[in-house]
Amino acid sequence: MAKPEIELVELVHIAALARIGLGSGLVARSQWRRVNLLKPDDSDWLLEATRTIVGGRQAASEVTTSFLRLMLALETGSTFGRKPGVTSVSVDDLRKDFIDAVERAADFDWGSDRDPDLLWLSSEFRAAGGRNQLSVEELLRALTDWQKGSRSGRERVRLVDGVLPGDGLNTPNRVQEQLKGLIRQVGAEGFAQRVARLKRLYGDDAERYEKELTEAFDTHSNLVAGLADSAVMDRSRRLAIGAADWMGGRVAIARGTRGNPCGFCAMLASRGFVYLSERSAIMTAVGKRYHPNCHCFPIMRVTTDELPERNKFFQEMWPEVTKGHYGADARRVWRKWADSQRAKSLGGK
């Protein structure tokens, strides 16, 4: 059975967001590696990291806004506008807007006349060798599947007054304020504390000290990349909160995953749709259940006649995999199974 168009669009969106998040993380890691191990100085790196996050969040916002406009049109027959005075829009125009945003994410290039922070991100991505390090295959495959797949019968949809509310936190100063605790932890200040500790422990053993210092620096580079990735994803998830509010009434939310999620995310995906009617519940479901380096995104529906294919698969596998196991033991068995599925998909045994 062919997948509904809305499901194909969701898979494209998740793949595009993952690319933007991972690409921003790659840039942040490259910037961190310019820090002096022995004299970590926060100033230049902090400015670069903040601007990278701002650019990544702007890119994610562009993709997610165009996705939400199309998703709402397909699901509800109406959507929010970009400017006042227009009462309807063709679904083909919404598709084109989304494709344009996705193709920019695929190229990791936002053109010469775009927001300066997007230009910065594009330039830093090229300088870091991002095109050779970050595969675009998943996104292009999802985009091709959608373009060759089924189409909704809707042609035009009604535009409702109002625009999608954002999170209002995408200037360098606001990003730095919002993330200052985490930036300190993973940035130069946190690393300087680690260096001081290693010096106390291994200061008399130069070889051991150098080894531990290099390992600590590599660990921090991964933390920096994870921070940038998570900050980018958080921007889009907050836009989803605005969309859930915009839809009003009882909104059903399910976990949308990439092809091979971790056991935790696969478990949440297996639970299917949960109806949410209060903003606090939406905030919890959309904004607080994501681990570091997670690229899941909420699937939102007004009607829940059929689960998306991935969710349905995990829902069917849960009782089979966990048969005879309960509670924490069931979750342990499930995680082991999910890890084995991921290993197989990556060419393992």
Language-model-detected regions and their locations in the chain:
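Intrinsically disordered, low-complexity regulatory regions
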Residues: 1-15, 33, 40, 96, ...
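Non-catalytic accessory regions used for complex assembly or targeting
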Residues: 1-113, 117-121, 130, 134, ...
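N-terminal nicking endonuclease/strand-transfer module with a His-rich metal-binding environment
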Residues: 59, 63-67, 72, 152, ...
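Prokaryotic Sec-type signal peptides and long signal-anchor helices
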Residues: 71, 84, 102, 112, ...
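Residues at alpha-helix termini
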Residues: 108, 150-152, 245-249
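A broadly conserved sequence feature marking short terminus-proximal activation segments
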Residues: 182-268
